[in-house]
Swiss-Prot record:
Cofactor: binding details: Binds 1 Mg(2+) ion per subunit.
InterPro entries in alphabetical order: Adenylosuccin_syn_GTP-bd, Adenylosuccin_syn_Lys_AS, Adenylosuccinate_synth_dom1, Adenylosuccinate_synth_dom2, Adenylosuccinate_synth_dom3, Adenylosuccinate_synthetase, P-loop_NTPase
Residues reported to bind substrate: 297-303
Catalytic reactions on record: IMP + L-aspartate + GTP = N(6)-(1,2-dicarboxyethyl)-AMP + GDP + phosphate + 2 H(+)
Function: Plays an important role in the de novo pathway of purine nucleotide biosynthesis. Catalyzes the first committed step in the biosynthesis of AMP from IMP.
SMART domains: Adenylsucc_synt
Binding site for Mg(2+): 13, 40
Organism: Fusobacterium nucleatum
Residues engaged in binding IMP: 13-16, 38-41, 127, 141, 222, 237, 301
Main location: cytoplasm
GO molecular function, one term: adenylosuccinate synthase activity
Superkingdom to which the source organism belongs: Bacteria
Family: Belongs to the adenylosuccinate synthetase family.
Protein name, per record: Adenylosuccinate synthetase
């Protein structure tokens, strides 16, 4: 069997979509195992840019694309995305949805907006797309699953009960107008007609493929440092975008996972609130942002930029049991002069070579850097590792040494062809 997992090692936006698109050329199945439409994945094919939110990044390839049990699905977003890529010539008949996946409802989106607007609450920086409230209902056992949509009577009963409870909150606590049951029910009946043929039990399908030694690529959204358990809590997402999240989010045994592929940007970025030890503020940080085009694929929000944090990198490598590292956007570092990588933190006079749990401690952390010589050459057309500038290779080799994990691919540009394959994944 061949189960490959691709995870982000930082705070997202590492370029997972591009790498998954490349790897999915030989994959029989590509499986999303967590998250929802709260993150954008950019895939560039022959200079043409595709921005995906909910669909697996491998949708542009021939392999079956699975939206797994651990994903939360907004049917409207799903159908809009299907329609958008079909209009550009892509086929989507190979996309299926787990009958165990939970459904994002209008009251989830409304609740998300309310929670982020309350003055006394910590501002997490949510995308306000209902992801967190949908996962909250899932854990509270109030959620509506895709399987419920296949039984209209059951869906009606669950929606009516949920909406009664949510409207109590909207009207009596927040003084808002109640949501209309009939409007929502009719809207979702329309969605059901368009997606019901895609709703299946994906667990036996994925496991059968693994048992038949087919290549199954598991795709995480967000990244390690946004994990609900291991990220910079509470500035995290509501699911587990780690290798361990595959077992619960896709329904496969950890024994069926052969490779853990960590995607790491050559510097570090973060969107929204939360601690960021290596953040570069001011003109130089803005320069990296401009060169790297560091703006959200979906929201357009500017990303905070900083030096490569290998305390975070080691943490991600260890927890995910990574077998391969993919370095992206190293071309952005060309011409920046001296480069820095963070190898430890100093907090209240104590040196940490790991990520502490306490967010307030991270806010006080001082990065301990190693400084390396940079390079000025344009590397975007280089195809062989040995053709990279000497200082670029030294940078990569030092990263590999600190992580104690081999770098297998180096991305030198946004197009799927702009990759240097050091060793086969």
């Amino acid at each position: 069997m061949a189960g490959y997992v691709v995870v982000g090692t930082q705070w997202g936006d590492e370029g997972k979509g591009k790498i998954i698109d490349v790897l999915s050329e030989k994959a029989d199945y590509v499986v999303r195992f967590q998250g929802g439409n709260n993150a954008g994945h950019t895939v560039v094919v022959n200079g043409e840019k595709f921005i995906l939110q909910l669909l697996p990044s491998g949708v542009l390839q021939a392999g079956t694309c699975v939206i797994g049990p651990g994903v939360v699905v907004d049917p409207k977003v799903f159908l809009d995305e299907i329609d958008r890529i079909e209009k550009r010539g892509a086929k989507t008949d190979h996309v299926i949805i787990s009958d165990r996946a939970h459904v994002i409802m209008p009251y989830h989106i409304e609740m998300d907006k309310i929670r982020e607007s309350v003055e006394d609450r910590i501002k997490i920086g949510t995308t306000k797309k209902g992801i967190g409230p949908c996962y909250a209902d899932k854990i509270a056992r109030d959620g509506i699953r895709m399987s419920d949509l296949l039984d209209l009577k059951q869906f009606e009963e669950k929606l009516r009960a949920n909406l009664k409870e949510k409207n109590e909150i909207f009207t009596k606590i927040y003084g808002l107008e109640p949501l209309d049951f009939d409007k929502i029910f009719e809207e979702y009946k329309g969605y059901i007609e368009k997606i019901k043929h895609r709703i299946v039990d994906t667990i036996p399908i994925v496991n059968k493929a693994l048992d038949e030694n087919k290549l199954v690529l598991f795709e995480g959204a967000q990244a390690m440092m946004l994990d609900i358990n291991y990220g910079t809590y509470p500035y995290v997402t509501s699911s587990s975008p780690t290798l361990g999240g595959v077992t619960t989010g896709a329904g496969v045994s950890p024994r069926k996972i052969n490779k853990g592929i960590g995607v790491m940007k050559a510097y570090t970025t973060r969107v929204g609130e939360g601690p960021f030890v290596t953040e570069i503020k001011g003109e130089f940080g803005d320069k990296i942002k401009g060169i790297g085009g560091e703006y959200g694929a979906v929201t357009g929000r500017p990303r905070r930029c900083g030096w490569l944090d290998l305390v975070v990198g080691r943490y991600a490598t260890e927890i995910n049991g990574l077998t391969d590292i993919v370095i992206t956007k190293i071309d952005v570092l060309s011409g920046l002069g001296k480069l820095k990588i963070c190898t430890a933190y100093e907090i209240d006079g104590k040196v940490y070579d790991y990520v502490p749990a306490d967010t307030k401690s991270l806010d006080k952390a001082i990065p301990i850097y190693e400084e390396l010589d940079g390079w000025d050459e344009d590397i975007t057309q280089i195809k062989k590792y040995e053709d990279l500038p000497v200082n670029c290779r030294k940078y990569l080799e030092r990263v590999q040494e600190i992580l104690a994990c081999p770098i297998s691919v180096v991305s030198v540009g946004p197009d799927r062809s702009q990759n240097i394959h050091i060793r086969e994944i």
